[in-house]
């Protein structure tokens, strides 16, 4: 049996694969419609804005090597802090590798976990 923690970690890994592969359907599936992302700069994006930025090349992801991941589940909500070395070119900048930390909130609906909130920082 797979634990909620394992499912959430796998979801985090799937998210990065979907960002790299520009897989709109998977990105739509794993992010709740209420999803909001706060970038390192403080810029806020809704689910639709975020996915559109990946699809149109505003946010380009090339690889991600995952490090520490901490998950805390509380009933049908959870928090995940994931640390990954991410190679990306974003907002017209050059390709570089970032030590990116994402702090997530998730919700479980009908037995499935979805990202509802993310805040990016570096570590």
Residue spans of the language-model regions?
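A beta-strand edge to alpha-helix "cap/lid" segment located at domain peripheries
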Residues: 2, 6-29, 34-123
């Amino acid at each position: 049996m797979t634990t909620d923690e394992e499912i959430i970690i796998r979801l985090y890994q799937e998210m990065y694969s979907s960002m790299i592969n520009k897989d709109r359907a998977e990105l739509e599936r794993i992010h709740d419609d209420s999803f909001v992302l706060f970038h390192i700069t403080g810029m806020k994006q809704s689910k639709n804005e975020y996915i559109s930025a990946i699809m149109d090349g505003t946010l380009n992801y090339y690889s991600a090597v995952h490090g520490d991941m901490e998950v805390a589940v509380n009933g049908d909500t959870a928090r995940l802090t994931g640390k990954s070395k991410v190679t990306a070119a974003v907002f017209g900048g050059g390709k570089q590798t970032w030590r990116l930390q994402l702090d997530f909130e998730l919700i479980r609906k009908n037995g499935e976990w979805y990202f509802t909130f993310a805040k990016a920082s570096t570590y």
